Regions:
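Core transmembrane alpha-helical segments of multi-pass membrane transporters/permeases
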Residues: 42-62, 258-283
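Interfacial segments of multi-pass membrane proteins
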Residues: 114-119, 329-344, 349-355
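Short, non-helical or kinked segments that cap or interrupt transmembrane helices
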Residues: 98-110, 151-158, 208-211, 320-329, ...
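N-terminal signal-anchor module of multipass membrane proteins
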Residues: 4-101, 109-119
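Membrane-embedded helical hairpins/re-entrant loop segments and their flanking transmembrane helices
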Residues: 64-92, 96, 268-341
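Flexible hinge motifs at transmembrane-helix junctions and intramembrane kinks/re-entrant loops
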Residues: 8, 13-14, 67, 71-74, ...
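Hydrophobic alpha-helical transmembrane segments of multi-pass membrane proteins
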Residues: 47-51, 153, 157, 182, ...
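Membrane-embedded alpha-helical modules
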Residues: 119-231, 348-390
């Protein structure tokens, strides 16, 4: 049996990962198993999640650039596939995975590795590398391999992990806030930040918990439309319905005719991205538990990695980019106190619907990033302070 500082490391799914659990200073309005009532309140909280966790728009364009693909229909089709798979993966994680309020979506690390594979070996090799990488990740979760790293994690690590993830979230927020440096966008960002602060700390109940949604709708949609910077043309041009299908890019001009190929170099290169995503997920699970005031248990690692792997295998079949846990959603939980996994399941359903309705997806894309970034700064700060206190 493995022993470390007097602890027994025989496998026990209910065993806490850390001997000393952090005390969260976050006021939880809805716990993991709570269901906000009435139903429309849960739907609004879910919509709030989708307003922040919509980065497939960035990763799809980045992937196309790395892959050297410039066909006009490629990015819109990839966007729909990513949202569709994002919904499946999120619902899978919150239902049969670790059952934490975690959103699964495309990540920069996996996007970069898969984009490089596409540039050298073509899209069929990307789906092959994604499928094998997801299979290996699933096996790692089923065999409980990843959870064994807990023997190297002393209790003091939990606060450091949560704080580090808070800094990552803050970096994302700052990048979004200053993604457009024209004076008008910076003023919108400042207005968004101040309005979000007022709603969060000077109001109570539904308004305080929904400060992200309210701020983004008022400033990001209404005010931006009035100022003429919300891109409604892309929304009007997008179709209402687009049905996802298996291997949607087969026969794409300039790409190999094969549906899927398995190339050793592509698989190895792709799995390097998967390994980074796996260890990032382990940290995200710790931060999520800290934000939810939930004990971080061994089962959260194993079931989470297994569900993430299964989700990546599904994305390979539908032509989406591999999915991993999203740091942004931890910030939403920490800032709003809404830790209900039912809300996150509803968000998964909304992402699924975005995959069927490109017009709705483009409405999200039209919201100026500085508005989203300014609001998300508050969420990132909540994560950092939670980690420092623990």
């Amino acid at each position: 049996d493995l022993k470390w500082e007097g602890r027994d490391f025989m496998y026990n799914p209910e065993q806490p990962v850390f001997e000393e659990q952090p005390e969260s200073n976050i006021e939880i309005a809805y716990g993991i198993e709570d269901v906000p009532k009435p139903w429309w309140k849960a739907v609004l909280f879910a919509l709030q999640i989708t307003l922040v966790d919509f980065t497939p728009f960035m990763w799809a364009a980045g992937f196309a650039s790395l892959a050297g693909i410039d066909q006009p229909d490629f990015v819109p089709t990839l966007l729909c596939a990513c949202f569709f798979c994002m919904g499946i993966c999120t619902f899978l994680q919150t239902t049969v995975g670790n059952r934490l309020p975690i959103v699964q979506g495309s990540s920069s690390a996996l996007m970069s590795s898969m984009g490089n594979i596409a540039a050298v070996y073509g899209l069929p090799a990307v789906w092959g590398a994604s499928l094998i990488g997801g299979l290996i990740q699933t096996i790692l979760g089923i065999t409980k391999t990843v959870s064994k790293v807990r023997v190297f994690l002393p209790p003091v690590v939990v606060g450091s992990v949560v704080t580090a993830i808070g800094f990552v979230a803050a970096r994302i927020a700052v990048q979004w806030t200053f993604s457009r440096q024209e004076p008008l966008y910076l003023v919108l960002a400042l207005i968004s930040f101040l309005l979000a602060l007022i709603l969060k700390f000077k109001t109570k109940g539904m308004v305080s918990q929904g400060f992200i949604l309210i701020t983004v709708v008022i400033v990001g949609v209404v005010v931006s439309s009035f100022l003429g910077i919300f891109d409604w043309n892309a929304v009007y041009a997008a179709p209402w319905i687009k049905i996802p299908r298996l291997f949607p890019f087969t026969g794409l001009s300039g790409q190999p005719n094969a549906v899927i190929t398995f190339t050793a170099a592509a698989i190895i290169g792709g799995f390097s991205g998967y390994m980074g995503a796996i260890f990032e997920s382990v940290g995200d699970y710790a931060a999520t538990c800290a934000a939810c005031d939930e004990i971080y248990r061994v089962k959260h690692i194993d079931k989470g990695i297994m569900a993430s792997g299964l989700g990546c295998m599904i994305t390979a079949l539908f032509g989406g980019l591999p999915c991993t846990s999203y740091t942004q959603n931890i910030g939403i939980v920490a800032a709003t106190g809404v830790a209900s996994r039912r809300v996150t399941q509803y968000a998964g359903v909304l992402f699924l619907l975005y995959g069927f309705c490109p017009k709705m997806a483009y409405i999200l894309a039209g919201i100026p990033k500085p508005v989203i970034g300014a609001v998300f700064l508050i969420s990132a700060a909540s994560i950092m302070f939670s980690g420092i206190d623990s």
